[in-house]
Amino acid sequence: MSEAEAQEPEPVPQPESEPEIQKPGIAAARNQANKKVLATQVQGTVKWFNVRNGYGFINRNDTKEDVFVHQTAIKKNNPRKFLRSVGDGETVEFDVVEGEKGAEAANVTGPGGVPVKGSRFAPNRRRFRRRFYRPRADTAGESGGEGVSPEQMSEGERGEETSPQQRPQRRRPPPFFYRRRFRRGPRPNNQQNQGAEVTEQSENKDPVAPTSEALASGDDPQRPPPRRFRQRFRRPFRPRPAPQQTPEGGDGETKAESGEDPRPEPQRQRNRPYVQRRRRQGATQVAATAQGEGKAEPTQHPASEEGTPSDSPTDDGAPVQSSAPDPGIADTPAPE
């Protein structure tokens, strides 16, 4: 017996099952279903209900007892409200169950099983309209890059013939918050397809020059649409003022321009003080006036007492003779 017992296989331990993740609403409903029911279809008046915290109290009409109510206990909520809630002073119908700390409400509805009105502080659901977006047409089966709507595709599947001069479908602009400034969208595919068609036509048929009427009307299929350029802003041309010629010398003569290329003058300092320039200009004018007076005054030589002419030449190079005294005047004695 001992050998038989030793040969028996040992039991393999089974792995423990992982706990299921449950939503709070489903878990609360299951807990309420497992709780003991004290009364059913009891009517009462909502004493107060906090929408943010999600709980409140209901005063029973029969026993005047306050019953705790949670937002998960509301069975039929207002379809226009985003959150489950009951309004203050609203008459509701509910079941009373035994909770951990006392009586609790369950399966809360309006009187007669209608949805509750809800609290005025509860947010309403967002009103939106359902928009039916057209699916983008497949570009592989298109000819000439023309977009076809689903309605036109259904008609084309029946007849498989559409008008050749059908305008391409325009894409709807994006919403305002998706738009970007200075953003250029992708080029339409009809240009590439048109270029392929033009090459095929040129191979099959003889090239024919477009007439002047076609060019004037703008129906040339080979000519792509003109591109729109935005002209850049350029600063207007403002010529610089000519440099003023500075006078040299006190006689007001300006410097004559030589035939040779003059050397460029060094750039002046723009931040020189104004007083310093006035002082330099005053000193230059004083020196120029002194030089001019020295040139204008001739040299004067005194006449000799004997009346002989002076041999010293003047600036002009001609000798200057002194006038002889009058004999009558010289012989007369001076009065005493």
From Swiss-Prot:
Q: Where is the composition biased (Basic residues)?
A: 123-134, 168-186, 225-238, 269-281
Q: Where is the composition biased (Basic and acidic residues)?
A: 252-268
Low complexity bias: start-end ranges: 282-292
Concerning Pfam families, the annotation shows: CSD
The superkingdom listed in its UniProt entry is Eukaryota
Q: Which UniProt keywords apply?
A: Cytoplasm, DNA-binding, Phosphoprotein, Ribonucleoprotein, RNA-binding, Transcription, Transcription regulation
Recorded hits in Gene3D superfamilies, A to Z, give:
Nucleic acid-binding proteins (2.40.50.140)
| Summary of the function given for this chain in its UniProt record | Has a dual function in oocytes: as a DNA-binding protein, binds to the Y-box sequence (CTGATTGGCCAA) in the promoters of target genes to stimulate transcription. May also function at CCAAT-containing promoters that lack the consensus Y-box sequence. Also binds mRNA to promote accumulation of the transcripts it contributes to produce.
The protein's name is Y-box-binding protein 2-A
Supply the source organism for this entry.
Xenopus laevis (African clawed frog)
